[in-house]
Amino acid sequence: MTKMDIRGAVDAAVPTNIIAAKAAEVRANKVNWQSYLQGQMISSEDCEFIQRFEMKRSPEEKQEMLQTEGSQCAKTFINLMTHISKEQTVQYILTLVDDTLQENHQRVSIFFDYAKRSKNTAWSYFLPMLNRQDLFTVHMAARIIAKLAAWGKELMEGSDLNYYFNWIKTQLSSQKLRGSGVTAETGTVSSSDSSQYVQCVAGCLQLMLRVNEYRFAWVEADGVNCIMGVLSNKCGFQLQYQMIFSVWLLAFSPQMCEHLRRYNIIPVLSDILQESVKEKVTRIILAAFRNFLEKSVERETRQEYALAMIQCKVLKQLENLEQQKYDDEDISEDIKFLLEKLGESVQDLSSFDEYSSELKSGRLEWSPVHKSEKFWRENAARLNEKNYELLKILTKLLEVSDDPQVLAVAAHDVGEYVRHYPRGKRVIEQLGGKQLVMNHMHHEDQQVRYNALLAVQKLMVHNWEYLGKQLQSEQPQTAAARS
C-alpha cells in the first residue's frame, strides 16, 4: 500500500479532542488502590503490580517490565476492569490499556496470550463495555477493540465481529439522524461533543478496514449503505474525510471494487469534490477514484467507473484542480493519472455507453442521445440486456425521483423504447412502468405532464404513422413551453 495508507493508520489511531482532553483528566486522577485492597475488592497481587506499573515513567522502563511480566499486566488490567464498578476507576484502567497499546502496537500480544490461556478472545473482555452509559468508557473500549482486532495476530470473527460492526453502524447512523434533525440531543452531551465521539467511531472503522478480511465482513454487514447514508447527509468535513477514507480502503480490494459498483458511489463523491474546500478531503476523493480505476480487474468494471466519473463532470473538476498548487505530490500524481484514464475513456465512449452511464447515475438530463432517432433505432433493444437492467433503473426513477427533469426525461425514454422495440409495451407493463408513467400525467410540472402524456400515447397507439403526424402538429406548442 502507499505511504498515504500509513498516514491513515496514524490518523485513525489518534483520539479526537474530547477524548484526548478527558483522557488527560483521567490520567491526572490517581486511584487509591490501597482502599480497594482493604475493601477486598482487588487481590494483593494486582494491587502490587498496578502500583509498580504506575511508577514506570519512561517508555523504556515500561517496555522492560512488560517484556518480563506481560501476562501479569494483562491479568491485572482485566481483573481490575471486571471487579471494580466505579466509573472513574474503569475509565482510568481503560486509559492505561489504550496508552499501553498506542505506545507499542506489538503489545496487543499480551492480551491475546492471556486470553488464550483462559480460552477467551482478547476482545471478549471489552465488548460488554460498549453497553455502558458513560460515553468516554464506551469509546475507549471501542478504540481498544479496534486496536486489538487490527494489530493482533488473530482475526476477530463470527458473532464478536458482527456485534462490533453493528455497534459501529448504529453509532454512525445516529449521527445521520442528528444531522437531519430527526432526534434531539439528550442529556449533557453537546452537539459538538457528540460529533467528536462519532469521529472516534469512524476512526475505529478506519483501523478495521485496513485489514482485508474485515472489508468483506463490513460489506456483508451492509456497511457500505451506512457510509453512503452519512456522506449523503450534511456531516462535518472531518467525518466526511473519514467516511471517504473508509471507501478508499475498501477499494484496495479488486473484489470490493466489483461489489461497490451497485452503490452509486461516484455521484456522491463527485458532489463532495465539487464543494470541497479542504485539501485532505480532495486528496482522499482523488485517491478513491484512482483505486476504482486502478484496482478493478475487469475491464467492464473500470469502464463503468470511468463513465460514471465522466457523467458526473469529474473531468472538468480535474482540469480546474490541475491549475492549483499542492504541497502533497500525491494529489498532483492522482490528478495526472485520472485525467489520462478518463481521457482514454472519452475516446472510446459510444452513445450507448453515455446513455447507460447517465441512467445509472440517476441524473437524467436532456443530453442529445435522448432526442436522437438514430440512437433509439439502434439501441432500444439493448435496454433489455442483463435481464432488463437499464429498464429497471428507468422505471425505478419514475417511482422514486422527485426531480421534474429526471421524471420528464425518464417518461420520454419509456415512450421511445416502446416505439422502437416491438415487444416493448409488454415488457414495460410487466415492470410496472405503464402505471408509473400514467401516475405522472397529472404532475404539477408541465414538462413531466407533457412527456408522460406522450409516453402513454405511445404505449396505447398501434398506428405510428398517425401518431407521427399528431406529434408534428404539437411541436410548436412544446417549443413554446420549453422557452
Curated annotation (Swiss-Prot):
Tissue specificity: Expressed in brain (at protein level).
InterPro entries: ARM-like, ARM-type_fold, ATPase_V1-cplx_hsu, ATPase_V1-cplx_hsu_C, ATPase_V1-cplx_hsu_C_sf
Keywords, ordered alphabetically: Cytoplasmic vesicle, Hydrogen ion transport, Ion transport, Membrane, Phosphoprotein, Transport
A GO molecular-function annotation: proton-transporting ATPase activity, rotational mechanism
Domain of life: Eukaryota
Keyword Cytoplasm appears in the UniProt entry: no
Pfam families (UniProt xref): V-ATPase_H_C, V-ATPase_H_N
Main location: membrane
Location of the protein in the cell: Cytoplasmic vesicle, Clathrin-coated vesicle membrane
Function summary: Subunit of the V1 complex of vacuolar(H+)-ATPase (V-ATPase), a multisubunit enzyme composed of a peripheral complex (V1) that hydrolyzes ATP and a membrane integral complex (V0) that translocates protons. V-ATPase is responsible for acidifying and maintaining the pH of intracellular compartments and in some cell types, is targeted to the plasma membrane, where it is responsible for acidifying the extracellular environment. Subunit H is essential for V-ATPase activity, but not for the assembly of the complex.
Subunit structure: V-ATPase is a heteromultimeric enzyme made up of two complexes: the ATP-hydrolytic V1 complex and the proton translocation V0 complex. The V1 complex consists of three catalytic AB heterodimers that form a heterohexamer, three peripheral stalks each consisting of EG heterodimers, one central rotor including subunits D and F, and the regulatory subunits C and H. The proton translocation complex V0 consists of the proton transport subunit a, a ring of proteolipid subunits c9c'', rotary subunit d, subunits e and f, and the accessory subunits ATP6AP1/Ac45 and ATP6AP2/PRR. Interacts with AP2M1.
Listed name of the protein: V-type proton ATPase subunit H
Organism (species): Bos taurus (Bovine)
Organism classification: Eukaryota, Metazoa, Chordata, Craniata, Vertebrata
Gene (name only): ATP6V1H
